[in-house]
Amino acid sequence: MANTVGGILSGVNPFHYNSSSPLTLFLFQACLILLVCNLIHIPFSMMRQPKVISEVISGVILGPTIFGQIPNYTNTIFPTSSIPGLNLVANLGIILFMFFLGLEVDIAFIKKHLKKALVIGIVTLAVPFGFGCLLAIPLFHTYANKTEGERHIKFSVFMVFIAVSISVTAFPVLCRILNELRLIKDRAGIVVLAAGIINDIMGWILLALSIILSSAEGSPVNTVYILLITFAWFLIYFFPLKYLLRWVLIRTHELDRSKPSPLATMCILFIMFISAYFTDIIGVHPIFGAFIAGLVVPRDDHYVVKLTERMEDIPNIVFIPIYFAVAGLNVDLTLLNEGRDWGYVFATIGIAIFTKIISGTLTAKLTGLFWREATAAGVLMSCKGIVEIVVLTVGLNAGIISRKIFGMFVLMALVSTFVTTPLTQLVYPDSYRDGVRKSLSTPAEDDGAADGLDSEGVDKTEINTQLNSLADVSKYRIGELTTVINTTEAISPSLKLLNYLSLGVSPKPKNNKHKNETSLSRMTTATDSTLKSNTFKIKKMVHIWSKSVDDVDTNLSVIDEKLTPFEGVGALRAIHLRLLTERTTDLLQSSSLYNDDPHFTANTDSLLQIFDIFSNLSKIPFSSEVIFSTMREKAANIATMKMDSTDLILLPLKGASYEYRGSPVFIDEKYANFDHIYSHLLGLNELSSTFFKSIFQSLKANFAVQISNTYGRLNADRFKRKRFNLLLPKPYLTQSDYLGLYLLLLICYRDGYNNDNASCSIFINSKNIDFAKDLSTAFAEHDWLNESTIKIVDIPFETKVPEEAIEKPSFIETVLDVGLSDTALADIEETTFIIGEDLPDESEPFSEEVRTVIFEGSNRRFDTLIVHHFSSE
């Protein structure tokens, strides 16, 4: 006893299993399992594979197949006496998993797509079930009841179980694949989601039937009793208890909470454990009781999402991986040592995959899908994953199948799950999906496109789509402004910029008695001008005949305004780009959001509600969307959004920030180099290392990155003058420079209407001698544009030559040193520097000048707006 208390210091072997202290070895086993699972998942995650594959493979590696071949490994690390402890934790995890699976079943969504879901779900279950019954015949005669001491299994029980194993579809894995491939909003994805729920429910019912048949011990009367009791228990839970629980939660205002209270969570867990206990003692399995309990939790106000978010972390991180790793430990591939064994393995894989694909494809085609859509639906329905492993483990523990058959079917589950994602991408590529969306677009949208009108009736043919000169800038217009919200901290700087860029219904300009006729001129130094003139030229009015019915009847002409590129009503779209993790909460939220009308997405997302309020106040047409994406797929998700070449995609990012570490003084740390701030940017905003390279190369619209470096300030002076500075460092202007100029002019124009008194300046390479004159000529009809509106400052600057050994200051460093006045430097935190970015080198995410601006902005605490113009030429 003394040695036991003393531990390893007293000579106790920590790998010796002690029944009086089983926790010691269990902790090591759990750490080993979780470590191997996460290491193996790294390469599989890059191939878009679900984590269950890594967890099962980890168990296979740690089990008798590989590590088990090491002498004394199994007796030391996983002794037989320690397995019950692992199984206890694993079974607790799978009970919670089945409860979460019940929470995922959306009855309202099934009703909405009931016809297609029933047809596809039943057919994709019935056809593989029938072929599974045929496969069970040779399997039974070859492997069943061959080992002495094993439980004798009837053929009917064996056949039902094998057929269920062949025919099930893994709904949780299916839902995650739909999210990762961005199919959950497509017609094929919606059909598969509904059919997967039907298939899943019916599969669990059939599995329960096989367990009941095996537990009845040959008595038909017992079988009937178990079936009746199970059905009665389901009715009790699904009707009186379900409505009673909803009534109690409403009366206690539980559904209105941001997260469930501990008491409500405890009561729901109590309901789940009671149901699992009851189904276990009547001879079914505790997982079915947990599944039934998940079905009765109300979905009002996304309560199931909030409940799952509160409960799921420890089960998903610890318990469930241990369950699937234990399933892998039971796989001994060394038992498959005959040719016929591998013949049955390949036959099982072929039957499981192709019966699902063929039946799903034909049925989906009959319901109205295109051939490739239907094929994708069939491929997705062939996914096995988590559910298959649970089914097989239940069958192994019940003695229905042997370890050899268990190993065969685990291989089938791994292969069928592994091929689902690449096969879906092969038969249903992005290019084909875009064509399907266009063919399914509404006639109203097609008519609008054919008429050349945007959402507000502005003639698109009069809007220039290219930016090759200052004359093009005067005719340019942004189609739709889309802001992609990646983090909560990006909301405030995004709204500040949108307040200047938004093209809402403009108020009428104030009349001024005195008109400033000063033209644009160049300045060699920067000085603060007087308050900006609010003078705006009276808009040109043209007489046109009205196209409205009322005016046609009265035969009256009306006066209409000819909108300039800086006027009119442009639409605003807000995209909440949420990180898709392994959490069940993300799956519940994504599936529930896409069940609603997409025009009302803002009502279900608190971040989008902020932009909805902003658009209402600004009188801007507004739409919104929530996109769940993995970190690796964020660039692809943004690039595949519906957009035109003249749209502007704005991505606000959180940059450098002040830190408060317990003292009343803020910590303002400086960055040593660009790589330091760049890694900080990626980490803060949950972006992959290839994000910017991918987005610049694949996005088919204008793109702007806003980096806010002033987050964390307290008591900021809200009345300081806002400053917007455009940097034109090249001796010539590129298309992205022209886009930056257009945005600066747009900010100036809107600022004149709003009377915000912002300062707008252009810092240009002094080699662009005729820039001011050319700008005045191009905007001769725009009297609002003069030197009181915008300042042009010459910056003597020589472009760096790579071969030169002497380090020269960058353009932004020169501007900060000699181009800004003392007042402007004092207001540097209220300043946004705009710079154009053409396609950077493949080896770097940004060009050298842009990298310098980002670096200086992070250390000097000014905001940066990097713009890139997309050219279809």
Curated annotation (Swiss-Prot):
Pfam families linked: Na_H_Exchanger (PF00999)
Segments on the Extracellular face: 1-23, 73-82, 138-154, 210-220, 289-316, 363-375, 426-726
Cytoplasmic side, ranges: 45-51, 104-116, 176-188, 242-267, 338-341, 397-404, 748-873
Membrane topology, record value: Multi-pass membrane protein
Record-listed Phosphoserine modification sites: 557
Keyword set includes Lyase: no
Alphabetic keyword roster: Antiport, Ion transport, Isopeptide bond, Membrane, Phosphoprotein, Potassium, Potassium transport, Transmembrane, Transmembrane helix, Transport, Ubl conjugation
GO molecular function, one term: potassium:proton antiporter activity
The family this protein is said to belong to: Belongs to the monovalent cation:proton antiporter 2 (CPA2) transporter (TC 2.A.37) family.
Job of this protein: Potassium-proton antiport.
Protein name stated in the entry: K(+)/H(+) antiporter 1
Natural source organism: Saccharomyces cerevisiae (strain ATCC 204508 / S288c)
